Amino acid sequence: MDATTGAVLYQKLQLWEPGMESEEEEEEEEIAEPLVLSLRRLQNTPGNKVGGLPGAWTRLLAGLLLLAVSSSLALRQLQGRNSPKGNLGPVDLPASRHSHHPGVYHHSAVISPAATCSRLGQELLVAGGNVVDAGVGAALCLAVVHPHATGLGATFWGLFYNSSSGNSTALTAGPAQILAPGLGLPTALPALHLLHTHFGRLPWSHLLAKPAMLAQKGFEVDAPLASALAAQGTEGLCPLFCHTNGTPLGLGAQVTNPNLAAVLLREALASSPDLVGNALLNLLVRDLGLELPSVQPKPSLEPALQLLLPQGVLFTTPGPSAGPELMGLLESTLHSKTPSPASCSSLLQTAETPVSSALATVDSHGSMLLLTSSLNSSFGSGHLSPSTGVLLSNLEASSVPSTWACPLILRGNLDDTEDDMLGLVASGIPRGAKAMACTLFNHLTTPQTQQQVQHQAQQRPTESPGICGKEALLQVVVHAEHAQVSSIPSGCCPFQGY
């Protein structure tokens, strides 16, 4: 190097890892700055001025830096092997220094009443499935582990927004039909299969495999199921949900339902959409000593109802769900600018509640699926089919709207694909349409920064136990190319994502 060469300029070298984004730069500056300052101090010492063997100093510094890094890594590996927690394998480095608050994910997320089913939904997402695959898989899982609130005998409503097409589609249950007085016709399998056929990505059999395995090998009674069993008693539910002495199973007890597993595996082999649900129906009528009904379940996919708002476009389900009532309430609420956001919580705290279940899946591109289902009462009819392990609903054939079903999606601006999206779906909330209207009004009148604070305050660890009652409101948000999930009350519904 010539003596005329200018001063050496040191530049910060930033470590790059897959998945890191621009938000990481601030954190990396804090880590890198002390190192850069130290190098600059050495550069300015008398022995390191131009003409003072700068090349030698540079090589020496590089050697010392490499030695320090290698020594540090070796020490960390040695500490890992000698850790009192045992051999944890290679040092666990975070995939990214870009951190999020709980419930915020780069790609996709699922939130449901059961930790097992939220994990199953996440597995389907990671396996290449979309939000419909994850939602349908989680719903089938809930049919196994939460028989008090949903199941193959339940009625399903859903709302799906496709970010690629910009279309929103409603899954409708069709008119309520009965097998016998007090026993509703099961429609869950035809409804979920219809939704998956049109919008899913993974094979139908793939979605049924894990729920069938849970039913066959067993699952733990979680807090919501244990609470429902304690309140319900055991009449009609033994031996599946009872101890040998006839008392109901408690928290942590193991349940196996091999007959339900067999039904799910048979349905996985259905050769055509028209045959989905037939295996279950044939076994049920045999159990009950009935003939096959002449009218088959008629779930359908229909365009969602739409309402233009100053803030964007609202989508919800058509009648006989509570969607039309929700639309009317929103129009009057937004015009009168009432109720006060503070009054929303009172709508979520009512003694008498319908029994239902809800889940939501979302991805960072804006696609989302909201599903809600009901057996009408806790454990439905209370009649456990011996050959199928299925509990039928006690829904009656009538024209009364499904007041528990009014999922909604707010698309911020159809002309801006980067705008925020919001999805809301409730379970067990009386006056559901009013509660949803109030919650949406709160969202529309709250500044964006305050919404972020509220979302963060609603989060608890994903494995939070069942600390809430039957009422829950699930919220999914797409903001800044991230998927966010939360619940009210906070922490009552486990979530997973990646």
Curated annotation (Swiss-Prot):
- Could you name the Gene Ontology cellular component terms for this entry? membrane
Q: How is it modified after translation?
A: Cleaved by autocatalysis into a large and a small subunit and the autocatalytic cleavage is essential to the functional activation of the enzyme.
> What does this gene product do?
Hydrolyzes and transfers gamma-glutamyl moieties from glutathione and other gamma-glutamyl compounds to acceptors.
Name of protein: Glutathione hydrolase 6
Q: Which domain of life is it from?
A: Eukaryota
Protein encoded by which gene: Ggt6
Which of UniProt's keywords are assigned here?
Acyltransferase, Glutathione biosynthesis, Glycoprotein, Hydrolase, Membrane, Signal-anchor, Transferase, Transmembrane, Transmembrane helix, Zymogen
Subcellular localization(s) per the UniProt record: Membrane
Bilayer topology term? Single-pass type II membrane protein
Record text on subunit structure and interactions: Heterodimer composed of the light and heavy chains. The active site is located in the light chain.
Entry similarity comment: Belongs to the gamma-glutamyltransferase family.
What Enzyme Commission number(s) apply to this enzyme?
Answer: 3.4.19.13, 2.3.2.2
Pathway field of the UniProt record reads: Sulfur metabolism; glutathione metabolism
